[in-house]
């Protein structure tokens, strides 16, 4: 299932503060995480879908890059994002 405009707006307002703040690292990580969750569910139902698996791996890589940037720039923002999205233990 793709991300609807309402879902995307909710994620942006939750992590970015205002609707126009889509470039914030926290917003990008949250949107990537939501898309990764949706693709993971799709791949559980369709295990032979190799194209979607590649897209999933690309999204995971993008999220990893943004998280590394956030960790290097501001460790506290990184920790709050990790805690809110429940990404790492």
From Swiss-Prot:
Superkingdom: Bacteria
One GO BP: translation
Annotated CDD domains: Ribosomal_S15p_S13e
Keyword rRNA-binding: yes
Database matches in SUPFAM superfamilies: S15/NS1 RNA-binding domain
SMART domains the record matches: Ribosomal_S15
One GO cellular component term noted in the UniProt record for this chain: cytosolic small ribosomal subunit
Stored PROSITE patterns: RIBOSOMAL_S15
MF terms in GO: rRNA binding; structural constituent of ribosome
This protein's UniProt keywords: Ribonucleoprotein, Ribosomal protein, RNA-binding, rRNA-binding
Quaternary assembly: Part of the 30S ribosomal subunit. Forms a bridge to the 50S subunit in the 70S ribosome, contacting the 23S rRNA.
Family: Belongs to the universal ribosomal protein uS15 family.
NCBIfam families: S15_bact (TIGR00952)
Function of the molecule: One of the primary rRNA binding proteins, it binds directly to 16S rRNA where it helps nucleate assembly of the platform of the 30S subunit by binding and bridging several RNA helices of the 16S rRNA.
Name the record gives this protein: Small ribosomal subunit protein uS15
């Amino acid at each position: 299932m793709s991300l609807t405009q309402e879902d995307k707006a909710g994620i942006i307002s939750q992590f970015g503060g205002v609707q126009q703040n889509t470039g914030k690292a926290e917003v990008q990580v949250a949107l990537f995480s939501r898309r990764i969750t949706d693709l993971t569910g799709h791949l559980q139902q369709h295990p032979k879908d190799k194209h979607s698996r590649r897209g999933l791996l690309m999204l995971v890589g993008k999220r990893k890059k943004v998280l590394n940037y956030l960790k290097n720039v501001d460790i506290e923002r990184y920790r709050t994002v990790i805690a809110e999205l429940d990404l790492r233990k």
